Amino acid sequence: MNYIIKQKPEDFIVKEVPNKIFNKINGKYLIYSLKKINRNTEDCIQHLSRTLKVPRKFLGFAGTKDHNAITEQYISVFNVQNLKSKIENIKGLENFSLEFIGYLDNPLSLGDLATNKFEITIRALDKKVDIENPHSIINYFDEQRFSKNNHIIGKAIIKKDFKNAVEELKKQNQTNNELIKTYKQDYIRILRLVPKKTLKFYVHAYQSYLFNELCKKIIIDDKINHFKINYVLGELFFATKEPKNYSLPIIGFGSEIQEKNSLVFNLLKKEDIDQRDFIIKQIPELSSFGTQRDFIAKVINFSCTEFEEDELNKNKYKVKISFELSKGSYATIVVKKIFAQH
């Protein structure tokens, strides 16, 4: 069934549910609620760093949030002298605002949240349908992670095929052609012209691709009833009933392959890679140890409104769904699962 999400920012609302209790009296770090609209989290953090004239490392957050959305999350700011009053007197913040919440003795860092709460308006629906609680999803990474060739660049870096990585980067206009001419075949130097964070994102995109492929192999191997939907890198398989959960590797040089060993090793063989390929001596900061991720993500506190006429799309319907997901899981996968069955 066709649909539209994020037709306007109010259609996609995300709020963090923290896993910490904030002190109301004092602490080494100030905690603020950051509310933003159509802004990247890191853009807001960099803006605050410049405005307050403090190092970027003084500011922390628990997770990045969607750009094309209204989001609410928590940030920490190192509590140096008079900084709280400086923040209170900031003027002219564009598309984001701050509200003081309390204190912590440690900074917020990636992963310091319990869940994310979503309110999503689904638009341009041809008809009213019965929407059932999905209860769980296969914990795929969704299309936002990949674009057209992010994972291809990532694999080229992992394989030390730096020439191909540069060629693929040129397709994304991530490199300066004049500098490429200057450095000619010094591909490692050319790659270092790209921000480190961006290069890491490409490596993570390839790791995410491997994870998705592993999930699909498990569905086939466990003979799980499923249906398929298309996405930017092929197909995703969705289980019709909740299957057994597994702790799966986000493959890196230090990943512990605890379950489904043969499927993991067959996938690595098919991709012609080895775990030690994730050690990148030429650009050490891109090396990736790896981590674990659940095969299944629970959909918590799911609810759905009645269908209404869609004021933005003539002769169409809209509906709002609300739910929570654990950190790192994709709300758009929940939407895919619900509407692919109609």
Regions found by a protein language model. Give the residues of each.
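Extended, charged/glycine-rich binding lobes that contact polyanionic ligands
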Residues: 1-24, 29, 37-40, 51-314, ...
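Ser/Thr-Pro-rich, acidic low-complexity intrinsically disordered regions of eukaryotic RNA-binding
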Residues: 41-47, 331, 335
